[in-house]
A protein has these predicted regions:
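Flexible loop/hinge segments at secondary-structure junctions
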Residues: 22-335
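Gram-negative bacterial Sec-dependent N-terminal signal peptides
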Residues: 3-19
């Protein structure tokens, strides 16, 4: 057994004992507690099966706690957390900037995310592929680094902006050709979240052409040998066979990875979207004991097994890698 495995096992045993030994009670003064005494959870509808099973697991250990679900989408979870109408917000992506600003305006600090898994892998038609870079199938590049991706799609990158394929190492007919970047509109959704979370909040480059739909983006790249796009949650196969997913490296010199199951499960894919539970925890104050116990359970082997069982579902959720699992447990211990 490796030292990391031993550390993980020891941490798991200690955490399991702590969770099982500490009873929790529903505080009726909490705004997320309904009149009938149930604990409200509002969040992503694709997570309903996961949260239902986590609730059942939690209730077996704490029979006095009951839950009510309203799973309407990630866009419903954060407003509910801001309003105090949910114990936590289950999301299958990072919080969008508008939701972050609204929460901060009310409380004066940011909501805290705790990852419990990864959201999706692919390509695996007919399921949707998680966020990925798409190029024309004739594109000669083996991959890009995340830094290069930011240089292509945004203006003002620290290492300079990139406008030509030759700047990325392409040769021959590609040497003089300009890069045509495509994506979704910068309207507070996926594209805006991408800018904020991955590209330092920089504005999109002048060469970025925003289109109205995912299908339109795929078709644009399929018709443009010099096109490139960053897009999430699309099954490109029925739209066009003229595009391919371009692998990514987290840092210069690191291996290129695509969003396949093994890579996502290992925590190596740079554009992986997390399955995470956002909580309201004021700086310097302890996290609500019931919420903390729930999150601890989600990070135990029993909780991770619930994510693992979803790997071939439409959503394709995966449990955390050993490294990320330890990191989230340590984060939670400090809350």
């Amino acid at each position: 057994m490796t030292p990391l495995n031993k550390t993980a096992l020891a941490a798991c045993c200690l955490l399991a004992g702590a969770v099982q030994a500490a009873p929790v009670a529903v505080d009726p003064a909490q705004t997320y507690v309904n009149r009938d005494g149930t604990v409200a959870i509002v969040g992503n509808d694709g997570l309903e099966e996961v949260i239902t099973q986590l609730n059942a697991l939690f209730t077996r250990q704490h029979p006095q706690v009951r839950f009510s679900l309203r799973m309407e989408g990630s866009s419903a979870g954060m407003p509910a957390l801001t309003a105090g109408a949910t114990a936590f917000a289950p999301l299958t992506r990072d919080m969008w900037p508008g939701d972050q600003a609204a929460f901060r305006q009310v409380f004066g600090y940011d909501a805290t995310p705790v990852r419990i898994g990864y959201n999706g892998h692919g390509p695996r038609p007919p399921a949707k592929t998680p966020p990925a870079v798409y190029v024309h199938r004739d594109n000669p590049l083996a991959g890009l680094t995340m830094e290069q991706l930011g240089q292509v799609f945004t203006a003002g990158a620290p290492a300079g902006d990139v406008h030509l394929w030759s700047q990325l190492g392409a040769t021959g007919e590609w040497t003089p050709r300009r890069i045509h970047a495509y994506g979704l509109r910068d309207d507070g959704g996926f594209a805006t979240g991408l800018r904020h979370a991955r590209f330092g909040k920089r504005p999109f480059a002048a060469q970025y052409e925003a289109l109205a739909s995912r299908d339109a983006v795929i078709r644009a790249v399929a018709a443009d040998r010099y096109g490139i796009a960053v897009l999430g949650w699309v099954n490109a196969a029925p739209i066009s066979d003229q595009v391919r997913v371009l692998p990514l490296a987290a840092t210069p010199g690191a291996p290129y990875y695509g969003p396949d199951k093994a890579t996502v499960r290992a925590g190596n894919y740079p554009l992986t979207m997390p399955v995470q539970l956002y909580v309201n925890r004021a700086p310097g104050k302890a996290l609500d004991p019931l919420v903390k116990a729930y999150l601890q359970l989600a990070l135990l082997p029993q909780g991770q097994a619930i994510l693992d069982a979803q790997q071939e579902s439409e959503e394709g959720y995966l449990p955390l890698s050993e490294t990320d699992l330890l990191a989230e447990r340590r984060k939670l211990d400090a809350l």
